[in-house]
Amino acid sequence: MTARHFDIAIIGSGIAGGALTVALKDSGLSVLLLDRRSGPLDTARGDHIQPVMQPVLSRWGVMDQLLEAGAERRAGTRWFDAEGAHIVTVPVPQGEDCGGAFLFLNHEKIGDILLATAEQAGAVNIAGLSDWSLTRAAGNWCVDWQAAEQSGSATCTMLVAADGTASTVRSRLKISLDRHRYQYPIAVLYGRQQGVSDERTLDVYLAQERMVSLIPRTGGRTKVGFPVSPEDIGFWKTEPEESLHRRLTEWCPGVSFDSLTFGAIYPPVSQQSEPYQGEGALVLIGDARHAMHPARSMGMNTCFRVADQLADSLRCLSSGFSEAEVLPLLSEFEARFEQELTPRLA
C-alpha cells in the first residue's frame, strides 16, 4: 500500500504541535499529527495566557472556546515582603493589541481545544503510538508507526519535532542540546485559599529564605510554588495537612487555606537545542526546542508566539511544495528565532 503524503508531519500533539496545526488551518497545507500519548495532557498543570497572545488566539479562532471551557481572568501580580506587607502591584500591560487581563485555564483543556480545532480544519491526528521510526527517501521524510495493533506509514516534505523536553526526534537525529539544571527543586501544593477576591491576582511573598508564589487556578483554587532543599522534600510529601498550613503561614503572613495538599516536586530545568543542520526540512518547536520548567506558562506562550511566526513564514507555500521551496523559509525562520526569541529565553 502506498503511504499517504502530507505537506507537514508533526511529531507531538501537545500544546506546541496543536498550536502550529491551528495556526496553519487556513493555509491549505495538509498536516499529520502523531503522538505516543493517548490520554489528556498533564492535568496537574494550569496555564496563564498572556494578554499579548490573546489577539493571536482570537485570530486562530480559539478564544471563544477557551472562555466557554471556563478560562478565568487574572489581574496583575502583587508582591509582599516577609512580614506580609504589600510592596507593589504590577498591573496588566494595557494596549490596543493585547487583552485586558491574563486568562488561566487547565493545561489539558487548552490542549484539547487546540487539537479539536485542528481536526475540524482537516488535520489528521493519530495518537497512542507504541512505536515509530523515521527515515529519509527522495527528498521526503518517511514515518512508520504502530498504534493499537495496527501499523501505518506516511511521507512528508517537512517534519516538525514538537515532542517535548525529552524529544525522541532530537535524540534520534543527534541534535545538540544545552541544558541547565537549577540547584533547588520546586515544591507545589494545591489548596483553596480563604478570602480570595473575585479579581484574582498572582501573589508573590518574599520570605526570608525563598520566594513563595500563590498562583490562581480555576474554580477558586490556588497553586502554591516555592523552592525547597532536597533534604526537605520528605517533609512536604509526608507531613499532615496541619503542618503544611503552619509552615506556609510562617512564609506568607495573613494567608490561610481551607484545604491544602501536597502536589508534586519539579526539578527546574532550562534547555535549548541547536537548530537542525542535517539533510531535509525539519524544525524543532516547543519544549523540544526551548524548555523552561516551571516557568509560569512562559513556555506555553512562547509556543504560541513561535507557532504563529512559523505559520507566517510558511504562508507563501501551496500544498505540494518541494523541499527546495521550504528550506530557505526555515533558514529565515531560524534566523528570526535567534534574533527575537533567544534573548527572551536566556
Predicted regions located by residue number:
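Conserved N-terminal helical subregion
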Residues: 2-5, 55-172, 180-188, 241
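Conserved FAD-binding catalytic core of PHBH/FMO-like flavoproteins
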Residues: 140-153, 158-268, 272-277
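C-terminal helical "tail/cap" subdomain of flavin- and related membrane-associated enzymes
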Residues: 297, 312-346
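Conserved N-terminal glycine-rich FAD pyrophosphate-binding loop of Rossmann-like flavoproteins
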Residues: 38-58
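N-terminal Rossmann-fold NAD(P) dinucleotide-binding loop
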Residues: 17-18
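Beta1/beta-strand and adjacent pyrophosphate-binding region of the FAD-binding site
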Residues: 2-14
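Glycine-rich FAD pyrophosphate-binding loop
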Residues: 25-45
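Short FAD-binding loop at a beta-strand-to-alpha-helix junction that anchors the flavin cofactor
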Residues: 277-294
